[in-house]
C-alpha cells in the first residue's frame, strides 16, 4: 500500500465509479455493496473483473486486504466526490432518521465474505471455483479471521435455532473446543454440528432427536460457526 493519503488523480473513470458506488452505499445504508452490485453499477460482467479492479484500488491505497484473510476486503479510504449521485446520497442521509445510522468510518470496518457453494474434492474451502458470491458483513457481528459462508440444508440443528435455509458464517480453523458449533467436511459434504469429545471418541452432535451423532474421526473441521443469518 502506498504511503500517505491516496491520490484521487490516479483513478481511472471506472475505478472512480466503483469507489463512488461503494461510498453511496455506505452513506445510504451503512455498509458497502456486494461484488455483484459493484459489477452491475460499473459495467463489469464478471466477479473476477470486479476483484481485479478492487485489487488495483488496494494498490492505490483506497482499499485494504488483510494478508491473513485473502478473501476479505476492508474498505478504508473513500474519496470525497462531488458527483450528482454522491450529493444525492448525502442529502438522503441528512433527511433520514438518524437512529441506527452508522458513521461511515465505522461502516468501513466491513469484510466481503465469500459464499461457498459446491466444494471441489481436495480444494481449499475458499478456492475460487467454490465461491458463488461475496457479501459485505460488519466486523462487529462476525468478528475477524478468515471467514466464509455456507447455507444450511436440513433440520439436524433445528433445536439449536439453526434452520434449513439459514446462512452460517464460519471462521476457518482446523480445531474446535468442546461444545462449539462447527462446519465439518464428511465424505465430501459440508455439515454443521456441535463438536463433542469424550472417552468414546470425537463426535459431531445434531440438535434434533431424530438424527444420530456422527463419529468424527474421519471428519475435517473447516471452522467454527461465529454467526447465523436468516432471511425473514
From Swiss-Prot:
It is an enzyme of class 3 (hydrolase). InterPro entries: LexA, LexA-like, LexA/Signal_pep-like_sf, LexA_DNA-bd_dom, LexA_repressor, Peptidase_S24_LexA, Peptidase_S24_S26A/B/C, WH-like_DNA-bd_sf. GO terms for biological process: DNA repair; DNA replication; negative regulation of DNA-templated transcription; proteolysis; SOS response. It comes from the Bacteria. Keywords: Autocatalytic cleavage, DNA damage, DNA repair, DNA replication, DNA-binding, Hydrolase, Repressor, SOS response, Transcription, Transcription regulation. Signal peptide: none annotated. The record marks 121-122 as: Cleavage. The keyword Plastid does not apply. Residues 86-99 have a biased composition (Low complexity). Pfam families: LexA_DNA_bind, Peptidase_S24. PANTHER family: LEXA REPRESSOR, LEXA REPRESSOR-RELATED. NCBIfam families: lexA. Represses a number of genes involved in the response to DNA damage (SOS response), including recA and lexA. In the presence of single-stranded DNA, RecA interacts with LexA causing an autocatalytic cleavage which disrupts the DNA-binding part of LexA, leading to derepression of the SOS regulon and eventually DNA repair. This is LexA repressor. It comes from Corynebacterium glutamicum (strain ATCC 13032 / DSM 20300 / JCM 1318 / BCRC 11384 / CCUG 27702 / LMG 3730 / NBRC 12168 / NCIMB 10025 / NRRL B-2784 / 534). The gene is lexA.
Amino acid at each position: 500500500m502506498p504511503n500517505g493519503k491516496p491520490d484521487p488523480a490516479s483513478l481511472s473513470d471506472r475505478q472512480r465509479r466503483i469507489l463512488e458506488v461503494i461510498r453511496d452505499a455506505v452513506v445510504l445504508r451503512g455498509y458497502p455493496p456486494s461484488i455483484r452490485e459493484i459489477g452491475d453499477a460499473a459495467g463489469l460482467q464478471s466477479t473476477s473483473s470486479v476483484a481485479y479492479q478492487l485489487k488495483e484500488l488496494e494498490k492505490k491505497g483506497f482499499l485494504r486486504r488483510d494478508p491473513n484473510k485473502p478473501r476479505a476486503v476492508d474498505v478504508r479510504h473513500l474519496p470525497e466526490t462531488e458527483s450528482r449521485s454522491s450529493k444525492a446520497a448525502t442529502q438522503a442521509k441528512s433527511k433520514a432518521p438518524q437512529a441506527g445510522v452508522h458513521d461511515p468510518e465505522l461502516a468501513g470496518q466491513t469484510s466481503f465474505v465469500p459464499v461457498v457453494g459446491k466444494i471441489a474434492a481436495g480444494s481449499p474451502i475458499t478456492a475460487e471455483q467454490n465461491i458463488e458470491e461475496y457479501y459485505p458483513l460488519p466486523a462487529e457481528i462476525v468478528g475477524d479471521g478468515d471467514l466464509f459462508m455456507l447455507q444450511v440444508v436440513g433440520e439436524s440443528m433445528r433445536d439449536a435455532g439453526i434452520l434449513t435455509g439459514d446462512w452460517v458464517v464460519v471462521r476457518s480453523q482446523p480445531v474446535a473446543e468442546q461444545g462449539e458449533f462447527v462446519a465439518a467436511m464428511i465424505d465430501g459434504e459440508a455439515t454443521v454440528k456441535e463438536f463433542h469429545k469424550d472417552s468414546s471418541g470425537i463426535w459431531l452432535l445434531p440438535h434434533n432427536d431424530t438424527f444420530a451423532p456422527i463419529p468424527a474421526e474421519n471428519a475435517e473441521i473447516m471452522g467454527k460457526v461465529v454467526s447465523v443469518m436468516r432471511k425473514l
